[in-house]
């Protein structure tokens, strides 16, 4: 099993969306997958419950966890890929997620403040980690500056990104089992390639 933790000490940067959507991308690619919701707000769990209430349940399990149960629950799950959603303001949960993860992914917007916080988070993480640009437009200067900062600071980052699309916000409480994955198929393909080889670009 490969465990991927999504974290950032800043809120509103797509951790929950990324956890659910990458899990769905993994499922579509033929892998068994699940999500551990370690955010006390329970956003991933709410997504799963809302999708089920709408008659379109997710095709993978979402289970809640906390700092005391995260490691045990992760070890008990038998899936190919496990994605862990975390809260931005709970250092104990964040560390517990990092401790069990094979790869830590830090989603971030491309604003200078977001990039600065993301790089700080990246530098504090032990083990393999990479930044993921989320809700971005490659045509804008902020995007180009973010990519340049990654290179200048020797920060590992996905070449895949999640574009800025209003439709992404409409995915909440849906099964997302059909239709576009809005770049998360590319994110998972790169992630899977990185975890399959020791020389992939998103590990350090």
Residue spans for each PLM region:
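P-loop/Walker-type NTP enzyme "switch/lid" segment
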Residues: 3-10, 20-95, 123, 169-177
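Short, well-ordered beta-strand core segments
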Residues: 82, 104-105, 129
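Short, conserved loop/helix-junction motifs that constitute active-site signature segments
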Residues: 99, 122-126, 150-152
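Conserved C-terminal guanine-recognition region of P-loop GTPase G domains, centered on the G4
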Residues: 115-134
């Amino acid at each position: 099993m490969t465990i991927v933790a999504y974290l950032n000490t800043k809120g509103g940067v797509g951790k929950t969306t990324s956890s659910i959507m990458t899990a769905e991308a993994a499922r579509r690619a033929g892998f068994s997958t699940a999500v551990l919701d370690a955010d006390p707000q329970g956003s991933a769990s709410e997504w799963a419950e809302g999708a089920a209430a709408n008659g379109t349940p997710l095709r993978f399990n979402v289970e809640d966890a906390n700092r005391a149960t995260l490691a045990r629950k992760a070890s008990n799950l038998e899936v190919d890929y496990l994605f862990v959603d975390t809260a931005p303001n709970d250092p104990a949960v964040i560390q517990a997620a990092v401790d069990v993860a094979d790869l830590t992914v830090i989603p971030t917007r491309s604003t200078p403040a977001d990039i600065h916080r993301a790089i700080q988070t990246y530098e504090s993480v032990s083990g393999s980690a990479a930044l993921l640009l989320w809700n971005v437009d490659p045509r804008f200067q902020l995007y180009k500056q973010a990519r340049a900062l990654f290179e200048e600071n020797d920060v590992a980052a996905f070449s895949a990104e999640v574009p800025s699309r209003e439709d992404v916000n409409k995915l909440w409480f849906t099964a997302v089992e059909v239709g576009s994955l809005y770049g998360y198929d590319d994110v998972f393909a790169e992630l899977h390639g990185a975890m399959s080889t020791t020389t992939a670009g998103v590990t350090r």
